[in-house]
Design a protein with these regions (language model features):
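Class I S-adenosyl-L-methionine-dependent methyltransferase catalytic core
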Residues: 1-165
């Protein structure tokens, strides 16, 4: 039996880097409001709480993800678990997804998802499920078989840290 490895603790808005001597350092990087990078809503910003617990996925990572998915997004139903800013789901809607389901356990962040859906004019294509994401995913209603599904799971760092500690 192997002992559990103690993972380094990260604070919101920080990441680890190595300096020229190979020592780990924590460097704060300010989070900026996420924007949609492709599709019909390209350039539009999402509602974002800069002091909140959410750290948006980098534009470049999202761009590579959607480059890999290509046209598979068109007409799909997207499920965005641990939605945070909803950047993945809103990006998919901008690129032609039929609808998006956002599950977010942090209630104030879920309110920001509602705000983004209103500001982007997507209220009729979005369902927001606030509460325990894992519990909801176990009881998730059956998804329609009329369209393909794409499921994004992007939990916060603290989620893994608390599960492995």
């Amino acid at each position: 039996m192997t002992p559990k490895t103690k993972l380094p603790q990260h604070k919101s808005g920080e990441f680890r880097t190595k300096n020229s001597r190979g020592n780990n350092q924590v460097k704060a990087e300010p989070a900026s409001p996420p924007r949609i990078i492709g599709g019909d809503l390209k350039g539009r910003r999402l509602a974002f709480w800069p002091g909140g617990p959410t750290r948006p996925m980098k534009d470049r990572v999202r761009e590579m993800t959607f480059d890999l998915l290509g046209t598979a997004v068109r007409g799909a139903t997207v499920v965005n678990l641990f939605a945070g800013t909803g950047a993945l789901g809103f990006e998919a809607l901008s690129r032609g997804a039929r609808r998006a389901i956002f599950a977010e356990r942090h209630f104030p962040t879920a309110d920001y998802l509602r705000r983004s859906s209103r500001e982007l004019g997507l209220v009729d294509r979005v369902d927001i499920i606030p509460g325990d994401v894992l519990l909801w995913s176990r009881r998730m209603p059956p998804l329609s078989t009329e369209s393909p599904w794409i499921i994004f799971v992007s939990p916060p760092w603290k989620f893994f840290h608390t599960r492995l500690a």
